[in-house]
Design a protein with these regions (language model features):
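Acidic-enriched, low-complexity/disordered segments with a strong bias for Aspartate over Glutamate
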Residues: 5, 15, 42, 47, ...
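Glycine-rich, aromatic-bearing surface loops/beta-hairpins
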Residues: 98-156
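Intrinsic-disorder-associated interaction segments
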Residues: 6, 26, 30, 34, ...
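Residue-level signal for alpha-helical context at structural boundaries
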Residues: 31-32, 55, 59, 146, ...
């Protein structure tokens, strides 16, 4: 797994997602949320296009650490200056690719709060991971509703 090879385990992704978990119809427990999130994460990473987007963020992070990004000094990279928005664009693209506008909404929640591993990652990888977790979280909530018992009107 390209993420694990770069220090971000599946467990870290799940734990990060669960820090902002809230009870929702069909997702009454964190255990159920973790199970659905993990399943949705596996589905997302089965898509080579997502893996390539993630890999591009990994490469950008490596180049930033080395100070070899075009028109961006190593010092500016390390400060994660606000005029650099490519990292946010990549994170939003990942979340939107996974789950459309719902994913972008969740991306913003995770990007602002920086739970779990997000607070420990560099300027590109925090947004890549926020995009993954945001998109997959949005799908988790949607999947939970879709899998509810249709005969139970008290679900919603």
């Amino acid at each position: 797994n390209v993420m694990e090879d770069n220090g971000v385990s599946k467990r870290a992704l799940v734990d990060t997602a669960m820090e902002l978990f809230f009870s929702h119809p069909g997702l009454e427990t964190q255990e159920k949320a973790e199970n659905i999130f993990t399943r949705e994460l596996d589905i997302a990473f089965s898509d080579p296009n997502l893996c390539i987007l993630v890999y591009s963020g990994i490469l950008l992070e490596k180049e930033g650490k080395a100070g070899t990004l075009p028109n961006l000094s190593k010092r500016s990279y390390e400060k994660d200056l606000s005029f650099i928005i490519a990292d946010e664009v990549l994170g939003m693209s990942i979340s939107k690719y996974i789950s459309g506008d719902k994913g972008m909404f969740e991306y913003v929640r995770f990007d602002k709060e920086k739970p779990g591993i997000l607070s420990k990652l560099g300027p590109f990888m925090d947004d890549v991971v926020a995009g993954i977790v945001g998109g997959v979280s949005a799908n988790m909530y949607t999947r939970a509703i879709a899998e509810m018992d249709p005969d139970n009107d008290s679900n919603i």
